[in-house]
UniProtKB/Swiss-Prot annotation:
GO terms for biological process: DNA-templated transcription; viral RNA genome replication. Coiled coil: none annotated. It comes from Barley stripe mosaic virus (BSMV). Its EC number is 2.7.7.48. The genome of this virus consists of three linear, positive, single-stranded RNAs encapsidated in separate virions designated RNA-alpha, RNA-beta and RNA-gamma. Three proteins (alpha-A, beta-A and gamma-A) are translated directly from these genomic RNAs and the remaining proteins encoded on RNA-beta (beta-B, beta-C and beta-D) and RNA-gamma (gamma-B) are expressed via three subgenomic messenger RNAs. RNA-directed RNA polymerase plays an essential role in the virus replication. It catalyses: RNA(n) + a ribonucleoside 5'-triphosphate = RNA(n+1) + diphosphate. Keywords: Nucleotide-binding, Nucleotidyltransferase, RNA-directed RNA polymerase, Transferase, Viral RNA replication. GO terms for molecular function: nucleotide binding; RNA binding; RNA-directed RNA polymerase activity. This is RNA-directed RNA polymerase. It comes from the Viruses.
Length: 771
């Protein structure tokens, strides 16, 4: 019999005597899976299997006695030789009605290679989903002790063919041929004609040996012809839990294919993991430079028309009156006249300060406005008690205590790793310095000023001459002494941090975005802290707290004593312009632990003043920090305690779109990511110290690396809202952002921002490159 396509009809034909009892339901399960199950589990306990086929012999074949025709064409395509080879044998011995032939048959049809046990079933799997049919012919004492189960295909639907054969009224189904069950007018006869598939023709029935029996029977012995045909469409719900004989081994396999929904099973695919993919939206390639200038003028009115070209010249050549104390000036140093240098002229007019030239006046101005203007804490404070409490809290909130490493950190390997990171110039200086440890002065530092001025994103550049940043740094040999140890300690700290606490240590844009990937896309209350004069406001409390933290990770002995001594009372010298001064405490901005010490000073101070144990996310980097709490979480203002205990002046920002290290934290397509501040970027495009096309090419390479997120219009749309929220722009910045992207990602357009006519120079950026 041909296979019914599309799994339309699954059938079992049971022809039985008058006392046939089914002790369990007859069940057909079919679909596309999987498991080999016996068709007749145990028909009679430990009875031999005798299977008849459509060849010469039939079991129980005697014309003169009560006979039974166990004609069960199980497999249509089996030849006589195949039957013999498979031990599907024939028996011609006569049997009485009480010794009726027991017919059992196990048929398992699966696709190649899933679940099959040849030794158990004794025959090969029939390929191509051959016929699923069973004909059971039994005598009056036949009892089925187990259900008849058929499992085939690969999809999983369970259908009950015969729920209770004798408890329910059986259906007698005739077909459209000559014979009908009980088919004689004058006598009671039985025609065991039960076509498995309703569309079988007469020739098909004959060829399949679904034959008719014409032997006379009394009315009480009329053969009951039952036929159950179940047509299953691709249904969504089938209740299989009431069928107790469903093998337990199927459960694990079923759960991978089916989606459970209460007590039902939905036939659909279940994925063990899902990934949400969001495509980028291309930014329109349109825009002009006036679009950018118009938005900047509207957001920072007056900044673009200020004239500061001669500010540095005025400071260097005219008299300066100011009060200075606690310092010494030496006027015998080299005098350098002010120089006007040629450079490219930017098209955009912004408040980007000009690059300064070093001089004694600039050093004194910077030293007075920076180092001598730090606040001084008035009042008594139990530093040891404060440090002990904050470190205990840090162990619970910031770190996994079992990951804290206190082993020896001064090893050859750690020193070699630090040495490999040094530049060729630094290595040459270290080799040339032959001083012994006892000859090194750990308390004397060098002093210098940075020529680059940080741009301010407000209106103060119109009225203020910004002070330069000061750098206090030790000799190279001092950094070489502490560098490997501090580097190893910071690596241990990072390894022990909890996942929601982030130390932004030289992270790339992609690495920083990975730290916020776990955040769910609902709103948080963001706490953004802005410290003023952070480095210069440090006291002994900060230094002792950081050293106490480093002690937890192995800093001890002579290294601890020398490091502590080098941070307290120091003497600074400007060897170029003759400025000398004593400094008490303060963070030395040029030693090997400037960034790490600033980071952990801020983190420990905020931990002491804020409930960081309830925070969802904390990120610290230098004097910048960002903390996320639940929306609506009530937080008291920490500025008073920070000033009274930690000597820190601060402002707390509560913007709708928080920022960290010059980047906005934005939720885009349900995922949080850091996006660079476009207002600061536009301000930098007005710089006047770009010398030539080679420097411009370096800037272009850096922009393409740091601002690649701008290539997605969805990012620009979210960034537009953040700019309006923070800078109170009178209108949307989307036109300026689109114009900005149009010019910065193509060098031929980018050079128009600086009136440059040269060609792009491809080169590798220096590790310390900043613009």
């Amino acid at each position: 019999m041909d296979v019914v396509k599309k799994f339309a009809v699954m059938s079992v034909t049971v022809v039985a005597g008058p006392v046939l009892t089914l002790s369990s339901p007859v069940v057909v399960t079919f679909g596309t899976s999987l498991i080999a199950v016996s068709l007749v589990k145990r028909l009679l306990q430990e009875q031999p299997r005798v299977i008849a086929h459509d060849h010469e012999h039939y079991p129980g074949g005697s014309e003169s006695s009560s006979s039974s025709c166990a004609t069960a064409p199980i497999l249509r395509n089996l030849s006589r030789d195949q039957c013999d080879s498979e031990n599907i044998g024939c028996s011609s011995s006569a049997c009485s009605p009480s010794e009726i032939v027991k017919v059992t048959r196990q048929v398992v049809e699966v696709e190649r290679g899933l679940y099959r046990d040849k030794q158990q079933f004794g025959m090969d799997v029939v390929k191509k989903f051959a016929v699923m049919s069973v004909t059971v012919v039994a005598g009056p004492v036949l009892t089925l002790s187990s259900p008849v189960v058929v499992t085939f295909g690969t999809s999983l639907i369970a259908v009950s063919l015969v729920k209770r054969l004798l408890q329910e009224q059986p259906r007698v189904i005739a077909h459209d041929h000559e014979h009908y069950p009980g088919g004689s007018e004058s006598s009671s006869s039985s025609c065991a004609t039960a076509p498995i598939l309703r569309n079988l023709s007469r020739d098909q029935c004959d060829s399949e040996n679904i034959g008719c029996s014409s032997s006379a029977c009394s009315p009480s012995e009329i053969v009951k012809v039952t036929r159950q045909v179940v047509e299953v469409e691709r249904g969504l719900y089938r209740d299989i839990f009431q069928d107790n004989e469903i093998p337990s081994v199927m459960e694990e396999k079923l759960q991978k294919l089916l989606y459970s929904e209460g007590e039902k099973i939905r036939r659909r695919c279940q994925f063990e993991a899902s990934t949400m993919h969001s495509r980028k939206v291309k930014v329109p390639e349109v825009g002009t430079i006036p679009d950018i200038q118009t938005w900047f003028d509207a957001t920072f009115p007056g900044n673009s028309v200020r004239f500061s070209d001669f500010d540095g010249y005025t400071v260097a050549t005219e008299d300066i009156n100011m009060d200075v104390q606690d310092c010494r000036l030496k006027f015998g140093k080299t005098f350098r006249p002010y120089e006007f240098k040629e450079s490219l002229k930017p098209v955009l007019r912004t408040a980007m300060p000009e690059k300064r030239q070093g001089s004694l006046i600039e050093s004194v101005l910077a030293f007075r406005k920076r180092n001598l203007a730090a606040p001084r804490l008035q009042g008594a404070l139990n530093e040891w008690h404060t440090i002990e409490n904050v470190l205990k809290k840090a162990l619970k909130v910031f770190f996994f205590e079992d990951l804290i490493d206190r082993t020896d950190h001064c090893t050859y390997e750690s020193a070699l790793r630090w040495w490999d990171k040094q530049s060729v110039t630094a290595r040459a200086q270290l080799v040339a310095d032959q001083r012994r440890l006892c000859d090194v002065d750990f308390t004397t530092y060098n002093f210098m000023i940075k020529n680059d001025v940080k741009p301010k994103l407000d209106l103060t550049p119109q009225v203020e001459y910004a002070a330069l940043q000061t750098v206090v740094y030790p000799d190279k040999i001092v950094n070489a002494f502490f560098g490997p140890i501090i580097k190893e300690i910071n690596e241990r700290i990072i390894r022990a941090l909890r996942p929601h606490v982030v130390f932004n240590s030289r992270m790339t844009a992609d690495e920083l975005n990975e730290t916020v990937a776990f955040l769910t896309p609902h709103k948080y209350r963001a706490l953004e802290i802005d410290f003023s004069k952070f480095d210069k406001s440090k006291t002994g409390l900060h230094i002792k707290a950081v050293i106490g933290l480093y002690k937890l990770f192995g800093l001890d002995g002579l290294l601890k004593v020398l490091w502590e001594k080098s941070q307290y009372q120091t003497y600074v010298k400007d060897r170029n312009f003759g400025l000398e001064a004593y400094l008490l405490y303060q963070q030395k901005s040029g030693n090997c632990d400037t960034y790490g010490s600033n980071t952990w000073s801020a983190a420990l101070a905020l931990l002491d003043c804020l409930p960081l144990e309830d925070a969802h996310f904390c990120v610290f980097g230098g004097d910048d920090s960002l903390i996320l709490f639940d929306q609506g979480y009530i937080i008291s203002d920490p500025c008073r305690q920070l000033a009274g205990t930690w000597n820190l002046e601060c402002k707390v920002f509560d913007f709708k779109y928080p920022a960290f290290c010059g980047k906005f934290l934005l939720c885009i397509d349900g995922k949080y990511q850091f996006v660079p501040d476009a207002a600061k970027f536009i301000t930098k495009l007005g710089r006047t110290d770009v010398r030539d096309v080679e420097v411009l090419s370096e800037i272009y390479i850096s922009i393409n690396d740091n601002y690649k997120s701008y290539k997605d219009f969805k990012v620009l749309d979210a960034l537009d809202k953040a700019l309006v929220d923070r800078y109170r722009s009178p209108y949307s910045a989307i036109s300026a952002l689109v114009s900005l992207c149009y010019h910065i990602f193509d060098f031929n357009k980018f050079k128009l921002l600086f009136n440059c006519e040269g060609k792009f120079v491809d080169k590798k950026l220096r590790k310390d490159f900043e613009w």
